[in-house]
UniProtKB/Swiss-Prot annotation:
Keywords: Cell junction, Cell membrane, Membrane, Tight junction, Transmembrane, Transmembrane helix. It is found in: Cell junction, Tight junction; Cell membrane. The keyword Lipid metabolism does not apply. It is a multi-pass membrane protein. The lineage of its organism: Eukaryota, Metazoa, Chordata, Craniata, Vertebrata. One of its GO terms (molecular function) is structural molecule activity. Coiled coil: none annotated. The gene is Cldn13. This is Claudin-13. Residues 1-8, 102-118, 187-211 are cytoplasmic. Belongs to the claudin family. Plays a major role in tight junction-specific obliteration of the intercellular space, through calcium-independent cell-adhesion activity. GO terms for cellular component: bicellular tight junction; lateral plasma membrane. Its main location: other.
Amino acid sequence: MVVSKQEAISFSVTSLGWVGAIVSCVLPVWRVTFPDDETDPDATIWEGLWHICQVRENRWIQCTLYDTRILVAQDIKVSRVFMVICTIGTWLGLLLCVLGDWRINCFMNFTIEENLLKVAGGMFLSVGLLMLVPLSWVTHNIIHGFFNPLLGFSKKVQMGSSLSLAWTSSLLLLLGGILLCVNIPVCRDFPRCIETPSARPSGANNDTLDV
């Protein structure tokens, strides 16, 4: 299997972005609400895509799944769908990238392998852009609420580490897609493309004619 340096970097960067997207999707730290002195002064609230957790000062954490009794924000519901689509789409892009690298050899149809890498790069770019939609929505709501003068400090929500990780993952996916799209190898870059089984020495035909 022939893999260029740019392809290896793109694959590594995109793999990191994919792992980061999965981790951010699982960990329930998208939004953090600090303790309210009037209700529960010891508990910090973590909100994720699937869980909501109470974290107390003694580091005791209690997490529960969202159910009908807990009102789930609309931006969180949409983020669930987008993040699942993005993680699956990135996995498919990585699979195409591996297949494209594995099948690049000059005794096969090089155009097919080149197209596989183009599709993989396009998928990485699309997934990275698609991930920005829920991230921007959630971040906008957090910032808007944080600077709302009608809310006290204890009611204000801040960005969690999972949301920051999701932003980083989205940028890594975009970077990996760009690197792959602009550095797709062409057949002439590989020595085996020149040396095909049908190649003959230049003097072979002359010897035949002399006989």
